[in-house]
Each structure stands twice: as structure tokens, then as C-alpha cells.
Amino acid sequence: MNLKVLVCVKQTFDTEAKIELKDGKIADAGINLIINPYDEVAVEGAIQLKEKGVAKEIVVVAAGSDKAMDAIRTALAMGADRGILVQQDTAADEFARAVALAEAIKGENPDIILAGHVAADDGSSQVPTRVAEILGLPHVNVITAVEIAGGKATCTSEADGGTQVTEVSLPAVISSQVSWNEPRYPSMKGIMAAKKKPVATAAAAAAESKVKILEFSLPPAKAAGIKIEDEPEVCATKLAEWMKNTVKVEVK
């Protein structure tokens, strides 16, 4: 098969990063940015389809500032063929981002559109579904396996403690769960090759965000834990009293 696979990726904060606020906004200075881990799974899935002879070309597309170029380069180093950066204000909401991505996708006419089912930073799980709706394509969410044959995708998804198998005609939007695969680490050869792979830039399609973020706030700090240092019997008594009087646990 000679299918074109397009993967939507996003640049997000490192999941281990400590988030700080300044004037009601996220202070991103000095915070490490990475490719969204869920999108990384989608990239790996695309590469595996190419290794199986299903896909001929893998295109990655990201919407955002120039910083999103790092996410694209990571995908290229993993094995994608070329990239597209849709230049867009990072404050754009999921609707505006989906419009921008969908417009870029239209120009590529891919057979399969992959994405992580959620972004690690906002957790909205909206963009793949919105892209599918805008393009008028079928969408299968949180897949853990996919087989391509006869112009159709047979997808396995998690569902209520079991699995669900869905068959859709291509082209289609398919969003992945992290359990689909284990993304590979880019090799040094891949990293060097990624620098020479083409990345086109495009202006985002005009779309006004439907959601406006007024400010961010951090959750209240957790109270310090209780530490009891004494003989075991005394510790047990003190702990029982604390549970009874503080958290209102019935102690018998």
C-alpha cells in the first residue's frame, strides 16, 4: 500500500516540570518543552505502519509558535518524512487549533490522520474529534491497536473494562491511547537526518477562539503530614486519637 499518514502533534510542558504562575499566567521561562507524549505514541504508530509497508509517507503537523518546531523535529528524528508548522497564537483554544490543523490537512489529502487522544497540558481531548468533524471524516478514539486493509481501518479501543473493535473506511481520524505502543528513542543518525528533512510553514486559518482564559491558579498547598515518633504502642494510641478527633474516623 502507498498510504499517506499525517500525524498531528503538539508541544507541551515536560510532565515533570514544576509549573509557576506570574500575573495570573503560566511562567514558561526555563520550563522544558517536549512533544506531547500521547502524540509521540501516534508518531510511533505511523512509523510502524510504514515499516509494515502500509504507509509510504508520514507527515507531521503542529499548530503553535516557533517553539512547536521542536516537536516536529522530534517526530522527524523518530522517522517521519516531513513536517508542517501552522503558525498560530499559543492562546488559541481547541476550536481554533482544530480549524488551523484541519485547513493544513485539507492541503495534504492524507489517507490516515493520527493524533494522541489528549494533550498532557490541557487534558481537553477535543482536537482530534473537532478535526474529524470539520473534515467530515469518521473518528475512532483511544485506540490500542489498528489494522489497515482494503481501504478500511479496524481499530481496537478500550471500553468499559473491555475492548471494542470498530471498522471505518479511509480516510479517517484515529486517536491513540498510550498503551498502543512504546515510542522509540530517536537515534543520533535520526537526529542528524531530521535537520535536513523539509518543514513547511503556513499561516493559521482565521478562526476566533470560543473560550477565553481569564487567569490560572494553582491548587492550595497541601498541609504538612503528621509525624509521630515514640514507642509503637504510644504511636498507635496517638494515631487513633488523631484519626478520631481530626478526620472523624470511628475508632473501635
Curated annotation (Swiss-Prot):
Listed InterPro entries: ETF_a/b_N, ETF_b, ETF_beta_N, Rossmann-like_a/b/a_fold
Location of this chain's protein in the cell: Cytoplasm
Database matches in CDD domains: ETF_beta (cd01714)
GO MF term list: electron transfer activity; nucleotide binding
UniProt keyword annotations, A-Z: Cytoplasm, Electron transport, Fatty acid metabolism, Lipid metabolism, Nucleotide-binding, Transport
Entry cofactors: AMP
UniProt GO BP: butyrate metabolic process
GO cellular component, one term: cytoplasm
A Pfam family per the record: ETF
Signal peptide start and end residues: none
Protein name from the UniProt record: Electron transfer flavoprotein subunit beta
Organism: Syntrophomonas wolfei subsp. wolfei (strain DSM 2245B / Goettingen)
Gene that this polypeptide is encoded by: etfB
